[in-house]
């Protein structure tokens, strides 16, 4: 119980300290007693106070208990970003359960694998994802429409919730990431690991009047920082509606809700620094991460928002969102951004190949210790034992997570990222195991083998390329073959893991030792135009779009009738085109139009106000519906 005398103090002076033994729901309940009428969540026109959040999640927790949910039981969340999603999340914890975020945009095979491994007793859905849930054969738990049940509970008497003893060491969620074995792996995170990243911290200072933006998909661990950073500190969580995403819309939501803190993936942050305009008077701290930071964009952002603090944050899912952070000073002039120093309740050391601690100034594998470490890889003791090991450090033996990242520790404790030991890459904040893509491709009956590489296109843009060796010789000259393979791959892997380019080969080059010579597999050029194509723009709109596409794709002479995505374009590149288009035209452009009209000629006609014939319009609408699924992978995008 909270001391009444404690409640009489000025709520602005109350600071909830980190206690590694407390559960998340206990801390949120304390916040609801400190300031019951403070706004907990904003979602469009909806607002929920801390008292309302506490009471609604209590009622839903009772409902879950009636369905048999108890301590340690898994509950799935096949939901978008929404106010109800946060209520469901908190109610699961109050019932003693463990939540598993499931992205409705993921392919059926991915969802089926996760469902079969976790076997959730209950799965929350909304009206849009209910049909999706019914199509996943291994999703056998009780299906609950979150909106319907919460709507009913809103007008019902609150039943008394039976107290479930949950401590900081108990699991709170299981989040699935890309796995090198060809299957996603579940990372089990404890309550204390979540609390530790947002309470009593050295890289960030939460205030009660802060508004934290929630723009990540719930299956991305940045959500952990957004939701629990707000609720455990008595702040307001501003949930960005899960609709068509654009930089202008992102900035608009931030401005309208008075966002003061946000996290952006590195790629999205770079676009934000390049294109986001307008006044954001309450914005005081932006964090970015998920890929190597760009000093140029950091400086550009600080010039545009000189009063805003900017931090480059680093951390694998296995260490709960962040493990290190670097605050970029206004006068930063270096050519590389470090990933910073260890955040509070976290340890960092650099190890050699024998897992011995190295002194500052030596490169080695980055290992992380502290309260942020995951409990395990769900139902995978061998993998857990491989990545979570005891290391003899100067401070004594510590349980550490081996990141696979190569880094260098400076004498002052600052860490610089130097590369990877394996074939894992990060694109738009998403961790991608290239081996997982290769495994999926090698299961395709039309292929005898496949190699997947990540190439740099320009100074920073990463491009996943699949090199395909078909079984049938006729496929070598079949232009439809790569598209057919990628179509089958989309039924297996999330959109963000689908290669943006393919190369069909009759054989792979070999080293003298007889192994595939991956270094000899060069990136294909961006195929901009067919030899017989009319690539010359004839209108102002076509000229402008050709320039924007060339800048985004790194190609010249683009065919006016080639689909943006067929040219290897990604959703992040499309956002770049959209932002540039709005900036050049000086007016808003519906981002959906770029999906619906995905060639230069079609989009130019749309911009000029010219109509398409009915058949082409229907085809464009159908194509847009498929291609817009990629936007759901953004986080602060979403992505």
Residue ranges and their predicted role:
Residues 1-174, 189, 196, 294, ...:
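AMP-binding/adenylate-forming domain of the ANL superfamily
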Residues 1-14, 23-24, 123-164, 194, ...:
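AMP-dependent adenylate-forming
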Residues 22-27, 306, 402-403, 409, ...:
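Short amphipathic alpha-helices and their capping loops
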Residues 44-48, 74-83, 102-109, 215-216, ...:
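Glycine-rich loop motifs involved in handling phospho/adenylate chemistry
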Residues 71, 171, 528-639:
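Regions immediately C-terminal to embedded phosphopantetheine-bearing carrier domains
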Residues 77, 83-91, 97-116, 158-358, ...:
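Motif- and composition-driven signal specific to adenylation
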């Amino acid at each position: 119980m909270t001391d009444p005398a404690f409640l009489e103090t000025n709520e602005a002076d109350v600071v909830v300290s980190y206690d590694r033994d407390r559960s998340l729901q206990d801390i949120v309940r304390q916040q609801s007693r400190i300031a019951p009428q403070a706004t907990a969540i904003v979602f469009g026109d909806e607002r929920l106070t801390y008292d309302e959040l506490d009471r609604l999640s209590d009622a839903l927790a009772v409902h879950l208990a009636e369905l048999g949910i108890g301590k340690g039981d898994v509950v799935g969340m096949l939901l978008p970003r929404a106010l109800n999603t946060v209520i469901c999340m908190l109610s699961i914890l109050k019932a003693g359960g463990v939540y598993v975020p499931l992205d409705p945009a993921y392919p059926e095979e991915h969802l089926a694998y996760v469902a079969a491994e976790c076997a959730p007793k209950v799965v929350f859905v909304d009206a849009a994802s209910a049909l999706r849930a019914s199509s996943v054969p291994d999703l056998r738990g009780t299906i609950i429409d979150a909106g319907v049940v919460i709507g009913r509970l809103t007008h019902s008497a609150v039943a008394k919730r039976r107290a479930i003893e949950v401590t900081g060491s108990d699991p709170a969620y299981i989040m699935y990431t890309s796995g090198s074995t060809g299957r996603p792996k579940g990372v089990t995170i404890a309550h204390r690991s979540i609390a530790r990243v947002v309470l009593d911290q050295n890289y960030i200072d939460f205030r009660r009047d802060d508004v934290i933006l929630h723009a990540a998909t719930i299956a991305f661990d940045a959500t952990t920082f957004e939701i629990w950073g707000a609720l455990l500190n008595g702040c307001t969580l501003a949930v960005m509606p899960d609709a068509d995403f654009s930089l202008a819309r992102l900035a608009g939501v931030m401005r309208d809700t008075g966002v003061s803190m946000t996290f952006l993936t590195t790629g999205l942050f770079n676009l934000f620094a390049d294109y986001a305009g307008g006044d954001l008077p309450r914005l005081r701290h932006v964090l970015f991460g998920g890929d190597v930071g760009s000093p140029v964009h950091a400086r550009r952002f600080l010039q545009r928002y000189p009063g805003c603090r900017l931090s480059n944050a680093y951390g694998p899912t296995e260490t709960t969102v962040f493990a290190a952070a670097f605050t970029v000073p206004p006068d930063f002039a270096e050519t590389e951004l470090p990933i910073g120093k260890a955040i509070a309740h976290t340890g960092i050391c650099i190890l050699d190949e024998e897992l011995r601690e190295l002194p500052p100034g030596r490169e080695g594998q980055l290992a992380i210790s502290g309260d942020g470490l995951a409990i395990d890889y769900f139902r995978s003791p061998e993998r857990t034992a491989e990545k979570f090991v005891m290391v003899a450090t100067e401070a004594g033996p510590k349980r550490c997570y081996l990141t696979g990242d190569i880094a260098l520790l400076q004498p002052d404790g600052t860490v610089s990222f130097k590369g990877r030991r394996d074939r894992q890459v990060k694109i738009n904040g998403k961790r991608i195991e290239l081996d997982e893509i290769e495994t999926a491709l090698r299961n395709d009956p039309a292929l005898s083998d496949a190699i997947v590489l990540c190439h740099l296109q320009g100074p920073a843009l990463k491009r996943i390329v699949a090199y395909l060796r078909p079984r049938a010789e006729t496929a070598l000259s079949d232009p439809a073959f790569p598209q057919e393979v990628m179509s089958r791959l989309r039924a297996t892997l999330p959109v963000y893991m689908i290669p943006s380019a393919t190369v069909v080969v009759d054989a792979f080059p070999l080293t003298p030792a007889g192994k595939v010579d991956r270094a000899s597999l060069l990136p294909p050029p961006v195929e901009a135009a067919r030899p017989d194509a009319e690539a010359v723009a004839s209108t102002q709109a076509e000229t402008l779009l050709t320039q924007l596409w060339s800048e985004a794709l790194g190609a010249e002479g683009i065919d006016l009738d080639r689909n943006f995505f067929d040219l290897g374009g990604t959703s992040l590149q499309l956002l770049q085109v959209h932002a540039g288009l709005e900036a050049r035209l000086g007016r808003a452009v519906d981002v959906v139009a770029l999906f619906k009209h995905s060639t230069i000629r079609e989009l130019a006609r749309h911009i000029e106000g010219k109509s398409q014939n009915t058949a082409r319009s229907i085809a464009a609408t159908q194509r847009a519906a498929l291609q817009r699924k990629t936007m759901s992978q953004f986080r602060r995008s979403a992505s």
